[in-house]
Amino acid sequence: MDNAHRQTQAHLDAACFWQIWQRFDKDEKGYIKETELDAFFDDLLAKFGIEDTLMEENVQKMKEQLMVGHDISKEGRILMKELASMFLSEDENFLLFFRLETPLDNSVEFMQIWRKYDADSSGFISAAELSNFLRDLFLHHKKVISEAELEEYTSTMEKIFDRNKDGRLDLNDLARILALQENFLLQFKMDASSTEERKRDFEKIFAHYDVSKTGALEGPEVDGFVKDMMELVQPSISGVDLDKFREILLRHCDVNKDGKIQKSELALCLGLKINP
């Protein structure tokens, strides 16, 4: 195995692989064409800072390894599982395909799940609760799995995440288990925009987190917004940190102290004046 290949396998995780894959398989067909392979490998190597002068040589080596060790269909289609098995560790491979079975749309949905299982706000869920969590997750997606499959999923998750064997999983563990789309807030650059652009962006942001369409953020909607805000500056956050920041946000923005953040209250917090 060449150095570039070893480097990517050592550092590539399921989320990163999926982000790159989606650029080429926008329709989620589960395969890319052989003609797209060079560009896919280019993106993969660029992610890990492989020098341009070495790019062509490494891409060629990777293609040769793929052709030798994996099946390519007569139509020139390369399945995602072929490339994933080539670049991801066993654990990350498992996570990738589990996530495809149980996708989530946004951080609000994620936080609804987290709050249900971290009912005491300890910042952890017990490994014993993991089995119930996984069963509910499949039911949420209208998928029924056998007890044997559930036991296998639970056992693998514990092996991957409960490394210190304390029987607990934290917020970051759950975030890795679940397939969250890229942080919604990353697409906005509030500081670099005109007032009108900021207002327009604010409308999109509020609409995204106001899942219940009540005109106010409450419960997991506030949690989801807080989680995405924090992850802009701190990629790895704990449940305890999230609760602290949530409390600070409510203290500053919840003017009428009803436990919710009205649209006008959030706008005021962000220094915006919007039409009522």
From Swiss-Prot:
Binding site for Ca(2+) 2: D162, N164, D166, R168, D173
Cellular component terms (Gene Ontology): cytosol; dendrite; extracellular region; nucleus; synapse; terminal bouton; transport vesicle membrane
Membrane topology designation: Peripheral membrane protein
Annotated Ca(2+) 4 binding sites: D254, N256, D258, K260, E265
Primary location group: cytoplasm
Full protein name: Secretagogin
Localisation per UniProt entry: Cytoplasm; Secreted; Cytoplasmic vesicle, Secretory vesicle membrane
UniProt GO molecular function: calcium ion binding
A Pfam family that the UniProt record links to this protein: EF-hand_7
Gene: Scgn
Triggers of expression: Down-regulated in cultured insuloma cells after dexamethasone treatment.
InterPro entries in the record: Calbindin_Ca-bind, EF-hand-dom_pair, EF_Hand_1_Ca_BS, EF_hand_dom, EFh_SCGN
Residues reported in the UniProt entry to bind Ca(2+) 3: D210, S212, T214, E221
Domain EF-hand: 12-47, 105-140, 149-184, 197-232, 240-276
Source superkingdom: Eukaryota
Residues reported in the UniProt entry to bind Ca(2+) 1: D118, D120, S122, E129
KW Nucleotide-binding (keyword) present: no
